[in-house]
């Protein structure tokens, strides 16, 4: 019998959660991560599944995700511990045939449950499936330090925030030309913040929760981690620049346009217009 802990998706989750912990983005039980799988991914590991998978209803049906398996982080679990005990901190779940709930097929031992942000993740998965024709498979939420810091000093406006991040590091416009969506402050772990995040995910692969953290979406764990890492690096540069008295010079609008043309991306118009 093949061991599911050696599968590409469990190993990928171990690496992503460990890297995020080492970055300082996921203190205590902060942050959560979900990866959409296919039946073929989990088929070799049926022998590892729970004999009687627990069923948990969703707070609202999500028929678009019917019969879809995911690997998810657990509620109250520490990213730093995933590498030590994957089965206690991760779980493979599968949405039922009508999208009304899911079974926990593997992991989340000792009656653990998926992340409290699962509604936000699943709603965002639905929107990114539609926005990318199924290409995006990962939703990652973390507490990226410098991005959070900027939400206290920059106007929490998509165009303003996006433009500052683009100017903070040349690669940013290439990596996230669609800009950064921003919510008002909202109570986490609710359907309301999940719906608001998903609405922004229709237009942006990055969504900021002011004074809290960031949501990122991408086709792979590496791409999604790299997306957040790129934005966070720019935020780190900006924090240093603002601490030194602000910008004396920066990347101009004309240079941003040239950058987009060189790499074949279309920058968010509202950010470019500032």
Curated annotation (Swiss-Prot):
Q: Which Pfam families match?
A: Aldolase_II
A GO molecular function for this record? rhamnulose-1-phosphate aldolase activity
Protein residues bound to Zn(2+): 141, 143, 212
Protein name listed in UniProt: Rhamnulose-1-phosphate aldolase
State its cofactor: Zn(2+)
Known partners and oligomeric status:
Homotetramer.
Keywords assigned by UniProt, alphabetized: Cytoplasm, Lyase, Metal-binding, Rhamnose metabolism, Zinc
What HAMAP family does this protein map onto?
RhaD
Q: In which pathway does it act?
A: Carbohydrate degradation; L-rhamnose degradation; glycerone phosphate from L-rhamnose: step 3/3
How many cofactor units bind, and how?
Binds 1 zinc ion per subunit.
Residues forming the catalytic site: 117
GO CC terms on record?
cytosol
Similarity field: Belongs to the aldolase class II family. RhaD subfamily.
Enzyme Commission designation: 4.1.2.19
| This protein's record includes keyword Cell inner membrane | no
State the SMART domains in the record: Aldolase_II (SM01007)
* Reactions listed under catalytic activity: L-rhamnulose 1-phosphate = (S)-lactaldehyde + dihydroxyacetone phosphate
SUPFAM superfamilies found in the cross-reference section? AraD/HMP-PK domain-like (SSF53639)
The protein's location, in the record's own words, is: Cytoplasm
Q: What Gene Ontology terms for biological process does this UniProt record contain?
A: pentose catabolic process; rhamnose catabolic process
Role this protein plays: Catalyzes the reversible cleavage of L-rhamnulose-1-phosphate to dihydroxyacetone phosphate (DHAP) and L-lactaldehyde.
Species assigned in the record: Escherichia coli O127:H6 (strain E2348/69 / EPEC)
Statement: the UniProt record of this protein carries the keyword Cytoplasm? yes
């Amino acid at each position: 019998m093949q061991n599911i802990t050696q599968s590409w998706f469990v190993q990928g989750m171990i690496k992503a959660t460990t890297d995020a912990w080492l970055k300082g983005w996921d203190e205590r039980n902060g942050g959560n991560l979900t990866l959409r799988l296919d039946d073929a991914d989990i088929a070799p590991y049926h022998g590892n599944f729970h004999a009687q998978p627990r069923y948990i209803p969703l707070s609202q049906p999500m028929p678009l995700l019917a019969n879809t398996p995911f690997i998810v982080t657990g509620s109250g679990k520490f990213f730093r511990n995933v590498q030590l005990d994957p089965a206690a901190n991760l779980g493979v779940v599968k949405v039922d045939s009508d999208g009304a709930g899911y079974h926990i097929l593997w992991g989340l031992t000792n009656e653990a449950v998926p992340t409290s942000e699962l509604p936000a993740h699943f709603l965002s998965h639905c929107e990114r499936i539609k926005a990318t024709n199924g290409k995006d498979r990962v939703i990652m939420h973390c507490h990226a330090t410098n991005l959070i810091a900027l939400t206290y000093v920059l106007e929490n406006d998509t165009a303003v925030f996006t433009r500052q991040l683009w100017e903070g590091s040349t690669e940013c416009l290439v990596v996230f030309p669609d800009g950064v969506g921003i919510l008002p402050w909202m109570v986490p772990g609710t359907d309301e913040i999940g719906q608001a995040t998903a609405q922004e995910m229709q237009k942006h692969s990055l969504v900021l929760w002011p004074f809290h953290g960031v949501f990122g979406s991408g086709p792979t764990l590496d791409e999604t981690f790299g997306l957040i890492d790129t934005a966070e690096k720019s935020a780190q540069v900006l924090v240093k620049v603002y601490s030194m008295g602000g910008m004396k010079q920066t990347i101009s609008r004309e240079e941003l346009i040239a950058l987009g043309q060189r790499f074949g991306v279309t920058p968010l118009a509202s950010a470019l217009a500032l």
